[in-house]
Amino acid sequence: NVPPTSPSQGNPGGPGRFPPGNTGIYGGGGGGAGGSGGASTPNNVGGAGGSGSSSYPGDSTTRAGGGGGTGGPAGGGAAGSGGGGAGTNYNDPGAAPSANRSGTANTGGGGGSGGRPAGPSDILYGGSGGSGVVIVQFANSVEGNDRISGGTRTTSGCNVVHTFNATGNFVVP
């Protein structure tokens, strides 16, 4: 948010750390729509992803959570609520590679970070971000709203909501 905007357009990631005498760098979690990413911990766990946020008042779905940071042998950072992916962990030589985590589809959640490989031929990529969603909301009192179509149509209080989880057309006759 530089320059600052209202409403907020996201939050910062958490700080990582490089412990003295260690060869690993442990990552902070990625920022989410509703909160900042967490710092990596003194016991070498990656930072948690920042929390997501609901898209409109009355929406019970949380979206756009941050991805977790890379951790030490103790583990990668937790996924941020709202579809973020968990971070991978550093692997000691001979340890099995940890799974890479992608953000949840249709949430816009961030992917978890990659980890240090167990060997020179291992590659531990970070996870992909989750596909996004488009939400169009308008007052139920809008004239002709029953002819407006596209996406999945629901109501929330006195509003009509059209949710698109895939490519589609929003038709206003």
Regions found by a protein language model. Give the residues of each.
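Low-complexity, glycine/proline-biased repetitive segments and flexible coils/loops
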Residues: N1-P173
